[in-house]
Amino acid sequence: MERYETLFARLKERKEGAFVPFVTLGDPGIEQSLKIIDALIEAGADALELGIPFSDPLADGPTIQNATLRAFAAGVTPAQCFEMLGLIRQKHPNIPIGLLMYANLVFNKGIDEFYAQCEKVGVDSVLVADVPVEESAPFRQAALRHNVAPIFICPPNADEDLLRQIASYGRGYTYLLSRAGVTGAENRAALPLNHLVAKLKEYNAAPPLQGFGISAPDQVKAAIDAGAAGAISGSAIVKIIEQHINEPEKMLAVLKAFVQPMKAATRS
């Protein structure tokens, strides 16, 4: 959990925002997935947001659903995902690692056992996409018991009560939603979110990272100009994996070429 605080303090000192890529663990297979994560970090990723393949991803658009299907086709299980997380943590001791997932996966293990396992492999945060703030008590309590930051989504239409709850219960960072709907690079992020960012700051919320529809450096810059601490990009990255599925080396090169200007856009 402290890795986020350390990261945001360091970035603030350098007058930089965070660039955070999202990928699905095990897409398109375990070995290549680990290489992808190394490539993202080498190219400048400040933190990682990782999905565990799940059969019914509600908030995901077709791009990320396909990533899940590819991981399933490779026979990737949640147990293997945790093994991967352990390997990633060993190799990269300081980078914040966040999971973005669905409640069924947490229930399958048992809530407390799930967060205990996260702590054991070195996961810093968990966002359970289909659990609203008002139903989050058992999740966030287990998370905090195991030194894992509970992450909450702040939608563009959040009212004062919701903003207060998010600020009060969230740790690590706040997932600031560019817009309602499903994920996807086609649906470009619509700003301004300045008023939300200002309110979150007023209530001392964890630093906001803007996600959904972030696919170009100008959007990263716009998010940071609006006061966000950084930006999360998922579908645009997963699409690169999809497009170069039969050219593993080229895939890694194209991913790096995508991440470098996205990271550069975080520097004011």
Swiss-Prot record:
GO molecular function: tryptophan synthase activity
Pfam families: Trp_syntA
Keywords assigned by UniProt, alphabetized: Amino-acid biosynthesis, Aromatic amino acid biosynthesis, Lyase, Tryptophan biosynthesis
GO CC terms, sorted: cytosol
Active-site residues from the entry: E49, D60
InterPro entries named in the record: Aldolase_TIM (IPR013785), RibuloseP-bd_barrel (IPR011060), Trp_synthase_alpha_AS (IPR018204), Trp_synthase_suA (IPR002028)
Catalysed reaction, written as an equation: (1S,2R)-1-C-(indol-3-yl)glycerol 3-phosphate + L-serine = D-glyceraldehyde 3-phosphate + L-tryptophan + H2O
Source superkingdom: Bacteria
Pathway it works in: Amino-acid biosynthesis; L-tryptophan biosynthesis; L-tryptophan from chorismate: step 5/5
Gene3D superfamilies: Aldolase class I
Entry EC number(s): 4.2.1.20
Function in brief: The alpha subunit is responsible for the aldol cleavage of indoleglycerol phosphate to indole and glyceraldehyde 3-phosphate.
Subunit comment: Tetramer of two alpha and two beta chains.
UniProt record similarity statement: Belongs to the TrpA family.
The protein's name in its UniProt record: Tryptophan synthase alpha chain
Native source species: Escherichia fergusonii (strain ATCC 35469 / DSM 13698 / CCUG 18766 / IAM 14443 / JCM 21226 / LMG 7866 / NBRC 102419 / NCTC 12128 / CDC 0568-73)
Name of the gene this protein is made from: trpA
